[in-house]
C-alpha cells in the first residue's frame, strides 16, 4: 500500500511501546507524511528520541492537551497552516487513574469518572470537530478501543465505561461526518504492554488468557494493530465507517 502524498496526524505516542507508535511505523513505511501531537514538553522529548527510527522526516510536532478546548482548536489551526490539509488522523488518547483500574467499579470516584470520560471519550469528539475543518476530501479518523468496552472485565472498570462511550461516539461521528465524506472507525486491540496498560491490575493474567484461549493462541503486537489503523486510514477502506474492527487474535469471538 502506497500512501505517498498523504498526511496523517498521530495523537497519543508516549514511547516505543505505544500503539500509536505502531501506527506511525506502519504509515511511515507506506510513505505517508506524519504530524504528531504531544501533551507537553516531556512527551516531546520522548518522541524526539525515537523519531530517528522512522524512514521519513516528520518534523511537525504540536502541543495539544485534549482537556483544553482552546488548545485543541489552536493545535489544528497550526497543523492546517503547516500542512495545507490532512488526509486522516489517529486518536490514541485515554486515561484513568491507577486507583480506578483496580478493585471494584462501585468504588469509582466522581472525579475519576469525569476524567476518564473526558480524556478517553469526549476528546475524540472535540478533536474531530477541529480536524474536519482541515481534512481533505475522503479523509478518515481512527481511534483505539478495547474489548472491555463491550464486556465487563476485571479491573478495567471506568475505562471500560469510557471505551463504551468512545465506541458509541464512533458511530455518531460516522453519521455526522459522513456527509462530508469523512469516515470514522475504531480498532479494538488485544492487550499489549504499554504505558497505559501498566496501570491495569493483574495485566499479566489477561495476556496469559489470550495465549490460552484466543483462536491464534498468541497476543498481538503494536505493528499488527498499526497496520490495521493504516488500512482504515487509507482509501482501501473507503467503504468502511462506524465500525469497530477487532485485532486480538480472535479472542473477542470466544464465549
What are these regions (language model features)?
Residues 2-36:
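Canonical Rossmann dinucleotide-binding motif of NAD(H)/NADP(H)-dependent dehydrogenases/reductases
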Residues 12-25, 94-133, 137-179, 191-193, ...:
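Catalytic loop of short-chain dehydrogenase/reductase
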Residues 51-70:
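Rossmann-fold cofactor-recognition segment
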Residues 183-193, 233, 246-248:
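Conserved SDR Rossmann-fold cofactor-binding beta-strand/turn motif
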Residues 214-225, 236:
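A conserved structural motif in NAD(P)-dependent oxidoreductases
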Amino acid at each position: 500500500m502506497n500512501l505517498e502524498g498523504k498526511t496523517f496526524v498521530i495523537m497519543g505516542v508516549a514511547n516505543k511501546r505505544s500503539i500509536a507508535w505502531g501506527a506511525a511505523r506502519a504509515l511511515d513505511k507506506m510513505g505517508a507524511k506524519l504530524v504528531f501531537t504531544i501533551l507537553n514538553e516531556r512527551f516531546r522529548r520522548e518522541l524526539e528520541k525515537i523519531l530517528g527510527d522512522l524512514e521519513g522526516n516528520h518534523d511537525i510536532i504540536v502541543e495539544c492537551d485534549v482537556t483544553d478546548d482552546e488548545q485543541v482548536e489552536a493545535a489544528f489551526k497550526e497543523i492546517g497552516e503547516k500542512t495545507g490539509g490532512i488526509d486522516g488522523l489517529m486518536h490514541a488518547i485515554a486515561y484513568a487513574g491507577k486507583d480506578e483500574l483496580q478493585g471494584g467499579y462501585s468504588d469509582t470516584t466522581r472525579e475519576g469518572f469525569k476524567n476518564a470520560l473526558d480524556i478517553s471519550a469526549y476528546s475524540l469528539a472535540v478533536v474531530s470537530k477541529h480536524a474536519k475543518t482541515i481534512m481533505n476530501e475522503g479523509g478518515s479518523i481512527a481511534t483505539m478501543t478495547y474489548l472491555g468496552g463491550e464486556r465487563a472485565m476485571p479491573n478495567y472498570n471506568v475505562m471500560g465505561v469510557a471505551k463504551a462511550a468512545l465506541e458509541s461516539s464512533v458511530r455518531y461521528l460516522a453519521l455526522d461526518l459522513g456527509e462530508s465524506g469523512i469516515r470514522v472507525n475504531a480498532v479494538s486491540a488485544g492487550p499489549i504492554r504499554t504505558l497505559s496498560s501498566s496501570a491495569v491490575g493483574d495485566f499479566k493474567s489477561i495476556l496469559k488468557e489470550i495465549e490460552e484461549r484466543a483462536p491464534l493462541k498468541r497476543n498481538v503486537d503494536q505493528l499488527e494493530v498499526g497496520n490495521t489503523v493504516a488500512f482504515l486510514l487509507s482509501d482501501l477502506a473507503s467503504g468502511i465507517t462506524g465500525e469497530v474492527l477487532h485485532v486480538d487474535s480472535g479472542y473477542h469471538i470466544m464465549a
